[in-house]
Amino acid sequence: MAKKVAVIGAGVSGLISLKCCVDEGLEPTCFERTEDIGGVWRFKEKVEDGRASIYQSVVTNTSKEMSCFSDFPMPEDFPNFLHNSKLLEYFRIFAKKFDLLKYIQFQTTVLSVRKCPDFSSSGQWKVVTQSNGKEQSAVFDAVMVCTGHHFLPHIPLKSFPGIERFKGQYFHSRQYKHPDGFEGKRILVIGMGNSGSDIAVELSKSAAQVFISTRHGTWVMSRVSEDGYPWDSVFHTRFRSMLRNVLPRTVVKWMIEQQMNQWFNHENYGLEPQNKYIMKEPVLNDDVPSRLLCGAIKVKSTVKELTETSAIFEDGTVEENIDVIIFATGYSFSFPFLEDSLVKVENNMVSLYKYIFPAHLEKSTFACIGLIQPLGSIFPTAELQARWVTRVFKGLCHLPSERTMMMDIIKRNEKRIDLFGESQSQTLQTNYVDYLDELALEIGAKPDFCSLLFKDPKLAVRLFFGPCNSYQYRLAGPGQWEGARSAIFTQKQRILKPLKTRVLKDSSNFPVSFLLKILGLVAVVVAFFCQLQWS
């Protein structure tokens, strides 16, 4: 008899969790509190309590080829970076292709998830839901929480003395939808993450002046990278990931600074991060430097105090006649339907094994999907999480002891702090390629490079030097997809397809890049064996 699994949320994590459950022969039921799929990526004009919210102009920060699910490439005519409506279209195509909607109960709110009295032996959960004012309860063999972490706004008003005196308008960035109504105003945006930067840029085109306050500074990257390719298809390769892991810390920090400053000198713009950490999640925005050059946006330090109409900053400067303050200060974790002890966040540390499993449960029948912030696309990340989780639920994969899991949680947190810092916004940060490989290894889907070097050297070179895409994790192991190799080698074609809207005369060049990659791979292998010989 198939195990019954409760999937909470029908956003990206919920949809892929449904598919993974079906692939493994489990019986899923998804509870979605709204009337449609898409989660945070479905734009609505009205902000709803308990639901993630985006502004109308949101475009993905990760490209389509690095964001698609591993056995379902996005249509080749889709743009590389998708408007939220286009991404929602992909989710609809995906849900229809794999017939997922029949598993979803819409407009159904999960009120509570509690262990059954015999949990220590059964591992079962009692899930109480509400729909149309009527409560129902059901018992499930396992639970997958797929609600994400972008719906409870974090507004640290106590950190802004004088906010109670401020006569202008202030609100969290989740309430921002479009620039209408802000024309001619002087606006202060607090927080320079992706949302804060996007909003500042958009408002700067019609506002009188926009100021953006950043505590530590930030790196700003363009979506356009080498030779015009999407940034993540160049940045996220196994070769680059290996270099970051084996080179000394000071060298890695220098390399990152050089790479980030290729586009523009961040120090000259007052943006260079002022901390000791190797990595800080960059802001993806193609317009920030130009808006700074135009004077439409001005970078400010931390707000020290607010008056009725002005903002006083830590460097002693004052900006008068502020009309609006927008807090782009992130989100707090909240799972009101869970017991407090189930998913604990203490001192900015999430007590989940590999950001997924509570370590203290007697039975491994509960998991969080998508509760992570990788330096890359969340979609392939959530998919690998769900693939592993469903195999754990089936008993095909097993978790280590509680002690081993707790040691991993502590060690992972120490590494996260060393790389990214201790602030709340960095709580879920992790290295992208390393984490994907880690999950793939658990399910037996990580590519075997030593074997591929002899069996399929062309593929081995592509996997090592090319983009670390999701297709790689369908080449072998459970869930193998026969189209994976072809998808890897036709990736460039799908990247360029939406750009080639003007016919040009054909020109061919000698493929020296492939030969250089072969030589580079040989050099890496030789260096590795030499190191073994001398160690």
UniProtKB/Swiss-Prot annotation:
Gene3D superfamilies: FAD/NAD(P)-binding domain. NADP(+) binds at T60, N61, S195, G196, S197, D198. Keywords: Acetylation, Endoplasmic reticulum, FAD, Flavoprotein, Isopeptide bond, Magnesium, Membrane, Microsome, Monooxygenase, NADP, Oxidoreductase, Transmembrane, Transmembrane helix, Ubl conjugation. InterPro entries: FAD/NAD-bd_sf (IPR036188), Flavin_mOase (IPR000960), Flavin_mOase-like (IPR020946), Flavin_mOase_2 (IPR002254), FMO-like (IPR050346). The chain crosses the membrane at residues 510-530. FAD binds at G9, A10, G11, V12, S13, E32, V40, W41, N61, T62. The modification N-acetylalanine is found at A2. It is found in: Microsome membrane; Endoplasmic reticulum membrane. It is a single-pass membrane protein. Pfam families: FMO-like. There is a cross-link at K492 (Glycyl lysine isopeptide (Lys-Gly) (interchain with G-Cter in SUMO)). One of its GO terms (cellular component) is endoplasmic reticulum membrane. Its cofactor is FAD; Mg(2+). Its EC number is 1.14.13.-, 1.14.13.8. It catalyses: N,N-dimethylaniline + NADPH + O2 + H(+) = N,N-dimethylaniline N-oxide + NADP(+) + H2O. One of its GO terms (molecular function) is NADP binding. Catalyzes the oxidative metabolism of numerous xenobiotics, including mainly therapeutic drugs and insecticides that contain a soft nucleophile, most commonly nitrogen and sulfur and participates to their bioactivation. Belongs to the FMO family. This is Dimethylaniline monooxygenase [N-oxide-forming] 2.
